[in-house]
Amino acid sequence: DTAKVKLLERLEGFAREEDPRVSQVMAHIAGSWEVVLVARADGHLAADVRPLVRVSVTVIMEEAGRREQGSAGGGGRYDYGFFSDERLHEYARAAVHQASVNLAAGPAPAGTMPVVLGPGWPGILLHEAIGHGLEGDFNRKGSSAFSGRIGQQVAARGVTVVDDGTLPDRRGSLSI
């Protein structure tokens, strides 16, 4: 689709304009559009339209024989109109900034050490570790290690996980 190609071309241009050390730009766009109809046995009907879009950009920067990368992106339960030029500029700036920081970075420390994860995207680690087993379809079919365990402790004391499908415009959000 021509509009999507133009969007990616704009994103590439914004990234290259940010810093002359940018030698490569890789941009990706993805989207889906679902129409969901739920029909209960009592005749109640509920419908939802669920768009989902995502754009990402990765840049390679080179300086003094060293090459580093940075990436950024975003999206959510929107249509492609979500990706304004201002938003695309933000993604390009963030990717270039990350690559620039990486160019100036020294070696990372190595070895065993404590790690503290804050809220937000680190939740992906949690999702990959246990999240798929918590998804409704696996539990409905009884194929999850968590099937039939509602109300029971399934993690170490002190671990609390809340899956909130009411957060607006997020990937796992529901509006019905």
Language-model features: where?
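Active-site bordering "gate/hinge" segments
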Residues: 1-174
